[in-house]
Amino acid sequence: MSGAAERVEFDAFDLGAPDARAAVLCLHGLTGTPYEVRPLGEAIARAGLRAFGPALPGHLRTPEDLSRVRHGEWLEAARDALEDLRATHRRVGVVGLSLGGLLSLALAAEGAVDAIAVVGTPLRLRIPLLPLLPAVRRVKPFVRKAAGSDIRDADARARHPSYDRMPLASVEQLRALQGLVRRRLAQVRAPILVAHGLLDATAHPDDARVILQAVGSATREILWLESSGHVVPVDRDGPRLAAAVAMHCARFA
């Protein structure tokens, strides 16, 4: 795990009152940890809701562990966590960053949520030689993240705990999940907030526009974060994003 992990809270979190009227599931990104969505959870808890942020399968372990996880396992884990919240709360919402955003959209397409917010969600990968990925990963299964995480604030980037290697098998699983989500966007009906950093070098801003246009939600809003990269909750626009997400969840969840 790279980053100054010893100085930050990167484990799963459960914030706010257990008996709050509504609960929000907060889902992190690929190779990341709950740390990167914790600021959103803290704002949601301050708004009077419960916020639960689990670690997705293969995370908080090793890149090798992550490489063996299939996209259906991520979705099943997210679905189970949401069902647990639904069992004890009248209303539930879901918030996701990147991979977590894809999972949030998949859950919303199942009609399982009352509100949704997604951040930096990649509908497609824009990687050179992408069709060769299955062959490349057989000889080079991991790619080192030499530049660290896609965060524009240097101090925040240094603190950010994540794997320092990306399993190419996990990239293939991400692509499979992207295809599933693209096919189901029109089935998303819950009020949605789509947020995206304009300096995001991982997920193209066009993906945010496509999500906003393709979902079936009657209430939809887009929020552009001008000074942030991909991991917006811990980047320069983090406080602005957290306030918007908490307001959205408190209004609709």
Description of each model-found segment:
Residues 45-63:
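Conserved alpha/beta-hydrolase
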Residues 201-207:
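Conserved alpha/beta-hydrolase "acid-adjacent" motif
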